[in-house]
Each structure stands twice: as structure tokens, then as C-alpha cells.
Amino acid sequence: MLINNSSANAKYNMVLNEKKISPSKTNCNLQWLKGALTPMLLDTETKFCDIECKFTIEAETEDEFEFKFSELNKEIIECVLKFDDINRLYKCYIQSVKEPVRITPYNWEFTCNWIGYKFSNEIIVKIKKEDSKNIKVRGNLKTPAMVEITPSIDLIDLVINGLANDPITIKNLHANKKIIIDGKEGTVTEECINKFKDTDLWEFPFLNPGINKISLSKNSCDVVVKYEPRYL
């Protein structure tokens, strides 16, 4: 098992005994009109899954255990978990850590509970001086996207369709200066400087599962789209 891409066993002399992972919770907004034979599904909202893990830490002394346990508690407040038998990652936020129980002179057992969401490794799609491209998105949930735009010439504006419900317009683009629209962080920068004032958008970039058709108003840019597939 990996915690933040480091082996839990190597770092804390810790083994995973048991894990329970729930499906992500989905809230359905339903309306059943008077006289209708079936309800109408208006929209859905997907939220966290629950993750429970039972661990054992081995230590020579109680003092050594307390040090390891303290360091672990700090690391798992917000973390990424990777289980050996699941080809998926879990972004997690701690909810509780139960009091450790000493089960042998050298072993302590405890349980951690997180909420989180499921995703897989980042996928990078390049659009090199083209005005359109179809992106087949893995996973089964909508996911935020990061868009990097590097124009080869100065441009008055660039309009991008297919990365949100409405077009995204960027103005005053400069040759060879990279603009990044980050759908996860909610930022727009040019060479690390805020460029939100030159951007017209109603929502930050995202991709839906399946085929997403991306179109650009000009073909003089190199565009990179990055996303992490998400799962229920």
C-alpha cells in the first residue's frame, strides 16, 4: 500500500489488515408531477465515498510507536492512497483515527476512516496547431481539466468549445507565452501571472466520460489537455 506515493510498510513498518471502500454517494434530484406515471430525474450530484482501513504498526518500544503514529497522523490528514490490488487512486480526507490497541509486545492495531473520491493517473492529450480534436475520456464521472495554451503568434483572442457548457474565450494571447486554465484549482495564469481579467468563462474546464469534441477558433496554438479519470 502507498500513502502519498510512499510505501506504508517501508516508512512506518505498517501493514494493512483490512479495508472497506463504499461506492461514491449519489444524490438524485427527483420530481414526481401530479398525474404522471413515473418520476422525472432532474439531475444528480456525486459526492464522497467512505474508506475504512485497519492497520498494524510494529515497533520495538512504545516510544518508537508513538513517534511513528504521530508522523502517520500528520501525513494522512489529506492524502492519496493506492492499494496493491486496485488499479485506482483515492484522494482522501481523514474523518477519524481510533485509539490504537496493543495486541502484542511489539504490535499496535488501529483503524482509520476517510472520505474521498476515486481517480486514476493523469492523462495528457496534445492538440498541435489543429482546430479540433476528439478526446475519449476514461472513467464514468465528470472530471476537471487543465488546459495549457501556447500560441505561436500574438492573438487578439481564442475561443475554445467543448471544455465547458459554454465557450471559453481568452484575449490578448502573446507568442510563445503559455496560458494555463486550471479546472481543479480554479485559476487562469500566463507565465504564472493572473490572467483572469482576459478570460471570459462561466465555468472552469471539465470533461465528461466518453467522446468530447474540442474545437478552437484558430489553429496557431499548441494546446495540452490534462485530466484524471474519475469513478463512482
Task: Identify the residue ranges that each predicted region occupies.
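Short polybasic amphipathic segments
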Residues: 1-5, 12-14, 79-82, 157-160, ...
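Polar/acidic, low-complexity leader/linker segments enriched in S/T/G and N/D
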Residues: 1-32
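Short, acidic/charged, Gly/Pro-enriched secondary-structure junctions
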Residues: 4-7, 56-97
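Short amphipathic beta-strand/extended segments with alternating polar/hydrophobic composition
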Residues: 10-15, 89-96, 167-174, 197-200
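Short, charged interaction patches at domain edges and termini
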Residues: 34-36, 96-129
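Generic beta-strand structural signal
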Residues: 79, 108-112, 143-145
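Intrinsically disordered, low-complexity segments enriched in serine, threonine, and glycine
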Residues: 120-232
